[in-house]
Regions:
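Short, charged recognition helix plus adjacent turn
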Residues: 60-79
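Residues in the recognition helix of alpha-helical DNA-binding motifs
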Residues: 8, 22-23, 33, 62
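DNA major-groove recognition helix of helix-turn-helix/homeodomain DNA-binding modules
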Residues: 43-58
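Short basic helix-loop element that most often maps to the first helix and adjoining turn
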Residues: 3-22, 74-77
Length: 79
């Protein structure tokens, strides 16, 4: 999932470590979030939204490739 975390963090002059301390997570977690290797849990997404005073959907953006195409149907489940 794409996100604006790096931009928001840098606008505040914070390092990844400083943001991690604010959130109660590791610096590695912040790095993984910023690079899109990790999607946040819902509680973490809410903490980020409160911290940056923005709606979650203005911080996180679904990957276009991950979105099902309009009119597409889910694949049938194997039985």
């Amino acid at each position: 999932m794409d996100n604006d975390l790096r931009v928001l963090r840098e606008q505040r002059g914070w390092t990844q470590g400083a943001l991690a301390d604010e959130l109660g997570v590791s610096r590695q977690t912040v790095n993984a979030l910023e690079t899109g290797r990790y999607d946040p849990s819902l509680p973490l997404a809410f903490r980020l939204a409160r911290l940056f005073d923005r709606p979650i959907e203005s911080i996180f953006h679904p990957d276009e490739e991950a979105r099902p195409h309009e009119g597409a149907h889910p694949a049938p489940r194997a039985r």
